[in-house]
Amino acid sequence: MSAVSSQELAGLDVFADIPAQDLEALAVHLQPLRAAAGEVLMRQGEIAASFSIITSGRVEIRHVAPEGQDVVTELLPGSIVGEIALLRNQPRTATVLAKDDVCGYRGYNRAFECMLAMPVVAERMVCTARQRLAAYIAPIPVLTGHGDGLFLRPVLPGDAERFHSSGSFSRQTLYRRYQGGAPTEARLAYLFEVDYVDHFVWVVTDGGDGPAVADARFVRDEDDPTSAEVALTVADAYQGRGLGTLLLVALAIAARVDGIRRFHARVLSDNPPARALGEKVNARWGQEEYGVITTAGDIPDLDDLPLDYDTRLRIEQVARQVIHAFD
């Protein structure tokens, strides 16, 4: 009899909506895990043989980049750690340290195969792994002609809180962007916890660890994988600095990397900034319904985008790192 209960597994968020009986094969291949506060569970650079599911206690994820800077993240109970190296078949990307006394489960190859055999679980793991890898990427400094210390990077889950608490977006800006009021908590989770493949988001921050002051995204069409809807938002105090154009170009670069060839958008007809931005890229507007206009067009070749070569190349490299992290 397994020392791990499938009923206990079914209570974890990562296995939400999966019946306990469907987790019995996985439970057989898991072992109980206990670690004291301060104990190292995994080390960056080592060959990966296992993953862990944390059910109680916090763990610290510490990644040392090639340039020497540390990226530290704290994970709460319900998290999976060690899965990135197994998914990529590469050495571990970070060190995992128990911040509290930790309990959970440890699994090896057979257990990981059981995880991957459940499509919903595999999709959740890959999405979370992409988000963690995105956190290791150094933000790209951007110049807007105002001497700002602004940075461009892929969105991270914590950006939902940065967006919600920054107070940089007026009611009018939020209304124009979301065609209604401020987004709900559930809506924010959708907007900022993305998979980077079918839903990709860039954010601009004021300072390396500062608030998110602009974001831009594309969401791939279900009926046409080469087409995507785009949307962007720029905080009021940062409008008129060229951020909208920069973000649209960055989206075009990421979309090309992701196999998308055509963009379309829906905006309120009383949204002058969006219309002005569209006219810069020769958008042709059409009426869809009262108060809403649409535009669509092919994404230009990268060589035709209005951005210097070095910045364009860096944006392309970053996009490729997250979009093709598991290719």
Residues of each region from the PLM?
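Conserved GNAT acetyl-CoA-binding A-motif
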Residues: 255-268
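Cyclic-nucleotide recognition modules
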Residues: 72-127
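Regulatory nucleotide-sensing modules
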Residues: 6-66, 81
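Terminal substrate-recognition subdomain of acyl/acetyltransferases
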Residues: 114, 123, 128-134, 138-148, ...
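Conserved acetyl-CoA-binding loop-helix of GNAT-fold acetyltransferases
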Residues: 234, 240-255, 280
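Acetyl-CoA-dependent GNAT
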Residues: 180-229, 235
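A short, internal acetyl-CoA/4′-phosphopantetheine-binding micro-motif in the GNAT/acyltransferase core
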Residues: 81, 97, 222, 231-240, ...
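A short beta-loop-alpha structural element at the N-terminal edge
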Residues: 151-165
